[in-house]
Structure formats: structure tokens, C-alpha cells
Swiss-Prot record:
Chief place of localization: membrane
Membrane-spanning intervals of the chain: 3-23, 40-60, 64-84, 102-122, 124-144, 165-185
Record carries keyword Electron transport: no
Compartments reported by the entry: Cell inner membrane
Family the UniProt entry places it in: Belongs to the MntP (TC 9.B.29) family.
Signal peptide per UniProt: none
Name of the protein: Putative manganese efflux pump MntP
Highest classification ranks of the organism: Bacteria, Pseudomonadati, Elusimicrobiota, Elusimicrobia, Elusimicrobiales
Amino acid sequence: MDIFTLLMIAAGLSMDNFAVSLASGCNPNIKIKDISKAALLFVAAHLVMFSLGWFGVSVIAERFDAYDHWISFGLLVFIGLRMIKEAAAKKGQQECVNITETFSRLLLIALATSMDALAVGISLSLAGVHFVLSVAAISFFVLITTFFGFKIGGKLGDKLGIKAEIFGGIVLIGIALKILLDAMM
């Protein structure tokens, strides 16, 4: 596999966390340390899932493949509905939820957005792609897209307020549906 293809796979893999970061960046009170914490946790979750896929190809592929899409779907729908519910409960307030406020929320989002990395780890391992190069590409894209997502979301958040949070919840549910439909096709 050529480097360009690997970079495109890494970029595609990072789009889920970009969408979450974009929607969550609308919180005007989010600090750079919170963004850094989210970015590092997103990278760590992607690397763990990618490594599980890479090194556990024969064991995990057979046992986990049957329901990984259901786990991703369930987590993303749960988080998406929760974001929409919290936004609707604000009754006109212009503050977005800080996904970094609680570690459990951030961890759930990191795990939900990294499920695809398991399948990518399996695929790239079977394709014979270099592990360190794959890890470097994925880490780079997840880190950069998370930071840019939060920053762009921060610029749009002043104008969008609660609408951005509702949109973020809808985006998560859309990603969940896409994961489920892709798995069923």
C-alpha cells in the first residue's frame, strides 16, 4: 500500500472525532487543556483499537466482528440523544455542553469514535502495511482533526449556540446509522 492511500485511510478514520470536536467546540468556556485532554484520549482510543485489530487479527476478527457495529451504533446514538436532550433542556441558553466536563462522557465518545480503528487495524495488518507508519499517520490525523474541530467549532459556536449542540447530536446519530448500514451491506 502506498503512503498516500495510508494517509487517506488515516484521514477518513479521524472524521468521526472531527465531527464530535466540531460540534463540541461551540462551548465558549472550553480551555486548551480540555481540548488537549480530548485530543490525547481520542488518539489513545484509536491506537488501542487499532493495535487490538492489528495484533489480534485471528482471535478478535471472528468474535468481535459480529457486533462491533452494534457497540458503535449504541454508544453514538446514546451520546447523540443525550446531547440533543441536554440542548433542548437549556430553553434558550446559549451554552454548549463541554464533552470534556466528565471523564466518563469523554471516554464514551473516544471509544465510540474509535471502533472503526479496530477494523482498520485488521485490514492494514492483513495488507502488510508497516505498523509504526500506520500508527504515526492515524495519531497525526486524529490529533490534528480534533484540535481543528474544537477551534472551528469555537468560532461557529458564538453564532450557533444550542443549534450546534443539537446538530452535533444529529451528526453522532447519523454516524451511528452509517456504521450500522455499512455493516449490514
